[in-house]
């Protein structure tokens, strides 16, 4: 009997403390855009307004929603897709045991109950990409939805997509996804990588990682599974994912040829693209820029080729002494992508894997090819973002952003960090967040998170949380630096709460309220400590903010400006010091 993945097998939590799910009505009937509303307490009887923030958690944090993973989540985009009249349902390819990396399907594999659904594709001669609509002056429902989430006009969204400066990854077979946008003129986004390996994890664990990552703020998910049950794992994830899902198709294609890179063929890869497009994958990482002539350049590197996809294609090219088939068949790939509106994430297969290799000839040679491929994709109205490094010291980061914008004509940049030093295994979420904040400020549109397990092992759900929060910090810091119009609102609210000793509001306004409260309560667990005018760092007598309050009260009582109060107060304290014998410690 086939098994199933149930909500009882994974940890699902309600909304974060002090928050509730709210919906903003869109311009069309039934369109409801989710937000998270953070309540605030009053200040001496004066109300503090609630703060609304971007929400990626999907229906899982809506108390009215009953989680039934075997049914998938709601499909708000389904009617929008059908009413445009340019898609058709068809039988689709047959799902085979080889898709899951086995010769015979296992009776113990939890098959998703609706795997026999009919996929959609563009009608003959039609193009269903958001870029195609945008270039034809059409503002889609997805664009209207995104405009509300970002606080901008729908026409601005349409223009950014039409010009290639932003992508709206939204496969027509992933109607569960809540539309979002990736572009440097919008909020900086964060991607979380999940996926099994040949030695670790189960389908239930990966579904849990997905719900966990989106709860903490992941804007997209990449399923990088390389073990068994790749197809089935992906089906469970997509049917329950409220955010876009990306993959690296070469991983599954390699499994289909028993892990032997030289046995890969265009036919196997093409079949894999169609398989994943029919499932609803929203963007593909495709390493079409790893050209045969670039591979010898990497021989003098400290760490060679560190990209899994890049090394697979390099091995194939060298064995056959032929050009990369992803490059030679790129136009055919575009034809597949535009039938389903799958976006390109052009892979940086030659990214530097060490500080010593940053900004070298191999890296920038590949970038030139990615610029060439971007033009080809845009000719087909297929959406494109560009993947970037990697390991780059701080003084070389800006050059990466400038070259990408120039060579790739402003297409969104999507970077892994970059890591700014190589000496901190176990802390690479920090070494990379430093670079991520910088490159986000310079213009990167999406940051791929790094967890503490980077270079060490497969991340678990706690590592996923740590990675997402760390990268939400970097992304928000970049938004602040870029002057995003709503970025300051939450900072200002938290600072006000901190100064007024509204401890619960401080916790609730933070990116990780549970962690903030946990750390506070380690030393001051009593409920009364939630209203105290100090914390355990300084205690009641040395709290700088309490002293600042005293100065303000002194000024108010003596009808003085704050500056005058400080000067007068200092004179009085100086006199008191002298009168008590000028002893430093009483």
Curated annotation (Swiss-Prot):
GO CC term (a single one): cytosol
Top-level EC class as recorded in UniProt: lyase
Amino-acid positions noted as binding substrate in the UniProt annotation, renumbered to this chain: 193, 222, 251, 287, 307-309, 348-351, 387, 414
Name the UniProt record assigns to this protein: Phosphomethylpyrimidine synthase
Role, per record: Catalyzes the synthesis of the hydroxymethylpyrimidine phosphate (HMP-P) moiety of thiamine from aminoimidazole ribotide (AIR) in a radical S-adenosyl-L-methionine (SAM)-dependent reaction.
Keyword vocabulary terms for this entry: 4Fe-4S, Iron, Iron-sulfur, Lyase, Metal-binding, S-adenosyl-L-methionine, Thiamine biosynthesis, Zinc
Cofactor (UniProt): [4Fe-4S] cluster
InterPro entries: ThiC, ThiC-associated_dom, ThiC/Bza_core_dom, ThiC/BzaA/B
Domain of life (superkingdom): Bacteria
Binding-site residues, [4Fe-4S] cluster: 535, 538, 543
GO molecular function, one term: carbon-carbon lyase activity
């Amino acid at each position: 009997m086939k098994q199933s993945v149930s909500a009882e097998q994974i940890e699902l939590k309600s909304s974060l403390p002090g928050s509730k799910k709210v919906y903003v009505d869109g311009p069309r009937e039934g369109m409801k855009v989710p937000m998270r509303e953070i309540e605030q307490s009053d200040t001496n009887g004066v109300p503090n307004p609630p703060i609304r923030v971007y929400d990626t958690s999907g229906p899982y944090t809506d108390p009215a929603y009953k989680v039934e993973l075997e049914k998938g989540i709601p499909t708000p985009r389904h009617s929008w897709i059908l009413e445009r009249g340019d898609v058709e349902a068809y039988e689709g390819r047959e799902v085979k045991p080889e898709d899951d990396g086995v010769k015979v399907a296992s009776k113990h594999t939890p098959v998703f109950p609706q795997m026999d659904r009919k996929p959609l594709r563009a009608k003959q001669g039609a193009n269903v990409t958001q870029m195609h609509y945008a270039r034809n002056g059409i503002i889609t429902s997805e664009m209207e939805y995104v405009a509300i989430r970002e606080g901008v006009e729908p026409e601005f969204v349409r223009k950014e997509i039409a010009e290639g400066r932003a992508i709206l990854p939204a496969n027509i077979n992933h109607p569960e996804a809540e539309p979002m946008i990736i572009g440097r003129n919008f909020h900086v986004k964060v991607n979380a990588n999940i996926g099994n390996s040949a030695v670790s994890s189960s389908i239930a664990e990966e579904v849990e990682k997905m719900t966990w990552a989106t709860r903490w703020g992941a804007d997209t998910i990449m399923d990088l599974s390389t073990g068994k049950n790749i197809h089935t794992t992906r089906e469970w994830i997509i049917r329950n994912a409220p955010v876009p899902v990306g993959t690296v198709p070469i991983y599954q294609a390699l499994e289909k040829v028993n892990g032997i890179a030289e046995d890969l063929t265009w036919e196997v890869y093409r079949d894999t693209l169609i398989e994943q497009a029919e499932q609803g994958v929203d963007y593909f990482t495709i390493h079409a820029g790893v050209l045969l002539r670039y591979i010898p350049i990497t021989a003098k590197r400290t760490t060679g080729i560190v990209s899994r996809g890049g090394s697979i294609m390099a091995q194939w090219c060298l064995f056959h002494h032929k050009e990369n088939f992803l490059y030679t068949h790129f136009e055919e790939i575009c034809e597949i992508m535009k039938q389903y509106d799958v976006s390109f994430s052009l892979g940086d297969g030659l990214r530097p894997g060490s500080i010593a290799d940053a900004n070298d000839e191999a890296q920038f040679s590949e970038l030139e090819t990615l610029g060439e491929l971007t033009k080809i994709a845009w000719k087909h109205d297929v959406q494109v973002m560009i993947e970037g490094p990697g390991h780059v010291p701080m003084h070389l980061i800006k050059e990466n952003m400038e070259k990408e914008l120039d060579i790739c004509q402003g297409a969104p940049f999507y970077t892994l960090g970059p890591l700014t030093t190589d000496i901190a295994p176990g802390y690479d979420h920090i070494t990379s967040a430093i670079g991520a904040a910088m490159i986000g400020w310079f213009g990167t549109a999406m940051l791929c998170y790094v967890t503490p397990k980077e270079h060490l092992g497969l991340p678990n759900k706690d590592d996923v949380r740590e990675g997402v929060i760390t990268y939400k910090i970097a992304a928000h810091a970049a938004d602040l630096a870029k002057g995003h119009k709503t970025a300051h609102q939450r900072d200002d609210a938290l600072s006000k709460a901190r100064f007024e000793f509204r401890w619960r509001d401080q916790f609730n306004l933070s990116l990780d309220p549970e962690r903030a409260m946990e750390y506070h309560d380690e030393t001051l667990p009593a409920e009364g400590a939630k209203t105290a005018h100090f914390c355990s760092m300084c205690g009641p007598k040395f709290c700088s903010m309490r002293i600042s309050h005293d100065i303000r009260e002194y000024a108010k009582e003596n009808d003085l400006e704050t500056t005058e109060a400080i000067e007068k107060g200092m004179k009085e304290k100086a006199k008191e010091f002298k009168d008590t014998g000028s002893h430093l410690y009483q």
